[in-house]
Amino acid sequence: MYEGNFLHLQNKVFNTKHNLLEKTMINRELIRIKIVQLTYAYYQNGNRNMDNAEKELLFSLAKAYDLYNYLLALIVSVTQEERHRVEIAASRAVREGTEAPSSRFANNRFAVQLEENKQLNLFMETQKRRWEDDMEAVRKLCDQIEQSTIYQEYMGGEEDSYEADREVWRKIYRTLIQENPDLDAVLEEKSLYWNDDKEVVDTFVIKTIKRFDPANKEDQELLPEYRDEEDRDFAVKLFRATILNADDYQHYMSESSRNWDFSRLAYMDVIIMQIAIAEMLTFPNIPVTVTINEYVDLAKLYSTPRSGGYINGMLDTIARHLIQTGKMMKTMPEPRPRRPYNDRQADRTPRREGRRPTIAQTSAQRVAAREQTEDAGNNDQVE
């Protein structure tokens, strides 16, 4: 009873902290993704320089935050382009004596508030990149917006409020920016990192749009890069533990692989389990079940179709062994008794096909290929 209550309390405390992390751009989910990618690259590239690898990790995370601000700035650039179009159309209407065009979207109150945002403007002043250098992409996006049902319904809608202005941009982002191959290609040309980051960063841009409050005016807070130094340290500590204690972690895997030939495991499976074990042993406040679930999800995206189930079983076995031997001071729920095979088959529901993943779906092979093209001696200079 005591152990069960303690486990419940541990998960409750963790979930409270996790909700706080949702208010930062770089959260644990993104950090785990980056560490999977960079650990794979660390071993594949043969460049075993820990200092360079850590610089690459932090630089990669910083680039994700750059993308977050750059995508917010895209909303501003689209608004400015729309304003320019309305001005031209208004001048033509005066000359021809026709009805002046509506400036509702050009003067969208949410977009204007974002345009005046002190934090975004301060950040963009430090950047060399400007959407003004890619006006063809901005104009193409404007055309797509103007042709969309979302835009037409907004322009013809009766509700005239800040909430309606904010909501139309949330819909536009989800429909026309989040899934936009042309825009993705432009971003990939800007930075090698951004192609892998965009799917995760998109979710934070949408959260930011929903958080905007007209009462905050130009002082509306954007998501900070990190909540505090603890989050930044999480990335460095997890990556360092993964690499420096690799032999110990792989020994635990070998012991728990039972009838499997450890040398024949998918290489990405080994990487993912190695990082998961590092997290379990390095961070006492993260519940074991949370760690296992996070890395099972990563395995489904980055490794083989069967990796999720196998890694789930392996990590569960390893965690219980570490607890029983006193190497890890955490608790886990008692394993459920296995039901007869025929009963399990009868209850099984068909797997959903075509499920879209919720985090960046980048194959490990593509990650490695990209990293191998970069100059190992200038990892902190890559753009």
Q: Where do the PLM segments sit?
A:
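Class I Rossmann-like S-adenosyl-L-methionine
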Residues: H8, N19-E383
